[in-house]
């Protein structure tokens, strides 16, 4: 996630807030935006193969409505992230916010990770006793995140050079990670 360093209290911008903002910007129901995000891997691969990603094969910069839906969503979310960052202190989780706001000096870019077994245990605790499905769900989620991030940033997801702080929540625990992040923001 990414945090704008400011002395006042931060506003959290989870995925759902960005979905609603993107939906309003491009005129689609938020449920469609969320559903499209869930199926993003296949469409990004398809768009990439067809050479239709934003900025790749367009002779001039297209209007937002002329872009594929996945691109419209990204552009609208990018705009929402930039506008929220201008308004005040905030925390973004995902959506390439670290990359979108990379030129700002008041940004703390954090990547929290854990080993697969620890993540699996946490997922089972969170989502219930669906162990046989959780492992595949985690794999697909990581794959979608990696493809999304790498497509829009041309950088490797999880590469330490993209972050100011990387924390292993499996070794440190969630509470210690929160404490360290709060100290880093000061």
Where are the language model's segments positioned?
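Short, small-residue-biased leader/transition segments that mark boundaries at the very start
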Residues: 3-18
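Conserved beta-strand scaffold positions in the cores of enzyme catalytic domains, especially
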Residues: 12, 107-109, 164-166
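ATP-dependent small-molecule kinase phosphotransfer cores
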Residues: 21-89
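Small-molecule kinase domains that catalyze NTP-dependent phosphoryl transfer to phosphate-bearing small molecules
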Residues: 33, 38-54, 130-175
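Short gly/ser/thr-rich secondary-structure transition/capping motifs
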Residues: 71-75, 90-94, 147-151
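ATP-dependent NMP and nucleoside kinases share a basic, alpha-helical "lid"
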Residues: 76-127
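Short, amphipathic alpha-helical "lid/cap" segments that border enzyme active or binding sites
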Residues: 78, 174-182
């Amino acid at each position: 996630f990414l945090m704008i360093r400011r002395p006042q209290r931060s506003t959290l911008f989870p995925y759902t807030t960005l979905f609603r903002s993107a939906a309003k910007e491009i005129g689609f129901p938020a449920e469609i935006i969320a559903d499209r995000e869930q199926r993003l891997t296949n469409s990004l691969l398809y768009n990439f193969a067809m050479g239709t990603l934003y900025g790749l094969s367009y002779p001039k910069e297209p209007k937002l409505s002329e872009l594929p839906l996945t691109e419209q969503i990204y552009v609208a979310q990018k705009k929402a992230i930039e506008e929220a960052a201008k308004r005040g202190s905030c925390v973004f989780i995902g959506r390439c916010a670290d990359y979108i706001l990379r030129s700002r000096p008041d940004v703390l870019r954090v990547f929290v990770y854990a080993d697969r077994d620890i993540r699996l245990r946490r997922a089972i605790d969170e989502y219930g006793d669906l162990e046989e499905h959780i492992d595949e769900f985690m794999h697909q989620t990581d794959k979608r995140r990696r493809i999304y991030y790498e497509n829009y940033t041309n950088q490797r997801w999880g590469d330490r050079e993209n972050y100011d702080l990387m924390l292993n929540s499996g070794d440190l625990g969630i509470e210690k990670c929160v404490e360290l992040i709060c100290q880093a923001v000061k």
